[in-house]
Amino acid sequence: MSIKGDIGVIGLAVMGQNLILNMNDNGFKVVAYNRTASKVDEFLAGEAKDTNIIGAYSLEDLAAKLEKPRKIMLMVRAGEVVDQFIDALLPHLEAGDIIIDGGNSNYPDTNRRTITLAEKGIRFIGTGVSGGEEGARHGPSIMPGGNEEAWPFVKPILQAISAKTDKDEPCCDWVGKEGAGHFVKMVHNGIEYGDMQLICEAYQFLKDGLGLNYEEMHAIFADWKNTELDSYLIDITADILAYKDADGEPLVEKILDTAGQKGTGKWTGINALDFGIPLTLITEAVFARCVSAFKDQRVAVSQLFNKTITPISDDKKEWIEAVRKALLASKIISYAQGFMLIREASENFEWNINYGATALLWREGCIIRSAFLGNIRDAYEANPGLVFLGSDPYFQNILQSAMADWRKVVAKSIEIGIPMPCMAAAITFLDGYSSEHLPANLLQAQRDYFGAHTYERTDKPRCSFFHTNWTGRGGNTASTTYDV
């Protein structure tokens, strides 16, 4: 009798191939399928040569070569393609079989697929996979959610192939039902946008604001790896700043300053608006990429305003430390806002997400892996009900001690004309969030004046609503809409 596979993988692009090789390295028998049969042959004759990986040349063949309950992972483009493969697979599956979507699917699609497939007896998992090609090959961060009945069957495989912390803890655990895993992956990607933009703002301040050269900036980022800023993105930034082109000049200086995006940052911002969460830093990071895309327009407008940035002549060591503190404090706000969004979704959908465990999922293997994720985990383990990460004593102390330098860097950037949308958004958010009184009383009065939207009074119990006839004309009709 032929040997059956432990899991099947559909999709032999680089991510799919590397996950298959990772599974093989961890002792699992994998059946590989691609819609283009020649890709299967090429893979088996190339990267998968002399392994235990099995090829399949139709979906029927794939299903026949798997142990029951069948476990099939889709590594295909998000969207309609996922639904097409699910529909094509169903005739070859039985009740209890498991489909795993490992792509960057939008969580409402995962919600829908989990429910509709459960009605057909198929258990569905939507899992975020982060870490890129290298992570897929040697250990990614994996964020599974969906039908929890499927988790015991796929847990040994997914945890085996995931990244591990220095304590050998897998960066993979059950996130929650339905689309919880893909939602957490979406927020991860949004935080990634924020982290990258914050680093870029620090880089521009060092380069244009302080007039530092690339060797000096490389040394600074390399030094920051030995601080609380230690992270994958700081690490690769140090490498990038040191990299020379063929002519010996820094390569990054020759890269066109227009940044691309795939849309997950936008998804994060849209969901923040839908849930009413002030995800100000991440949305500014998305908009910064949008601004960068207008290269020709930026060149034209720059000639209208004749902006010249004059480097600061003060003690550069003090400014470098101030930038480090501003970067760290802003990063804390980015993660704080991200976890506020995760909490709101978890409560809204009753996902019961463990926030400390979520931080652990990102500790290794993914793009935002960093040392202080361990501190985030500690904060939520000490206080699972923690609403704002900055309220934890460890993070509160960092924010408080960074405040003066943080303000100094943002103010100076505005003074000399360096755009700093994310650092400015971060400190502005904290100023607003830590204010007992905001000018929203005037705003609500304006709404009541022109739209009879009503207001609450400070001298009356909450949820008691009032309307004023501000002009003495018209009636006392009040809008029924107070909050969005």
Curated annotation (Swiss-Prot):
Annotated binding of NADP(+), by residue: 11-16, 34-36, 76-78, 104
Catalytic activity annotation: 6-phospho-D-gluconate + NADP(+) = D-ribulose 5-phosphate + CO2 + NADPH
Residues holding substrate: 104, 130-132, 188-189, 193, 262, 289, 447, 453
A Pfam family the protein falls into: 6PGD
Entry EC number(s): 1.1.1.44
Keyword Transferase annotated: no
Keywords tagged on the record: Gluconate utilization, NADP, Oxidoreductase, Pentose shunt
Active site: 185 (proton acceptor), 192 (proton donor)
Functional pathway: Carbohydrate degradation; pentose phosphate pathway; D-ribulose 5-phosphate from D-glucose 6-phosphate (oxidative stage): step 3/3
MF-aspect GO terms: NADP binding; phosphogluconate dehydrogenase (decarboxylating) activity
GO biological process: D-gluconate metabolic process; organic acid catabolic process; pentose-phosphate shunt
UniProt keyword annotation of NAD present: no
Cited NCBIfam families: gnd, PRK09287.1
Functional note: Catalyzes the oxidative decarboxylation of 6-phosphogluconate to ribulose 5-phosphate and CO(2), with concomitant reduction of NADP to NADPH.
Family of this protein: Belongs to the 6-phosphogluconate dehydrogenase family.
Subunit structure as annotated in this protein's UniProt entry: Homodimer.
Name of this chain's protein: 6-phosphogluconate dehydrogenase, decarboxylating
